[in-house]
């Protein structure tokens, strides 16, 4: 109750982030390229919030989000699977929207190298947090940040399994944000957790036959 009785700028930003997050999730669920526009705006809101709450890795992640949004938009808008026609996942270049990258499955040959990169990122970010910040949750903060970086890359590639990566991130973040007393954002990520399951099923239906 203290949170709502002392409602100020930080709390208002938390609420604004909730609204933007819901818009982003809807656009992602629909596989709309406009999700990348929201991906440029939303990090500004969440970045300030995370800095105020001492979630420094999450703050740094917001900078990555902005850069990834530019990359993601370019990938979805101009990249096509037939440019990688020698790969199994690119045999059908058809796209639900003309000129856009189609949804495909995460190729098995990339699982191991991506997992290695993810573990390396986790270790590096954890070391940075315990060495250079006063983070009270370095293990969880570094884990969600590292996995989010991988998931965002998978989203830019338009792999359906990016939803499964976000499922793990969102579940952990829900608990983390409750602990850090950011209730609106915690509710948003709890909703994200549920929607990740539905989004995965929805994207599977959109994969070209």
What residues fall within each predicted segment?
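Hydrophobic/aromatic-rich structural module bridging two neighboring secondary-structure elements via a short loop
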Residues: 39-89, 93-99
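Polytopic alpha-helical membrane-helix bundles and their juxtamembrane interface segments
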Residues: 1-31, 35, 42, 79-87, ...
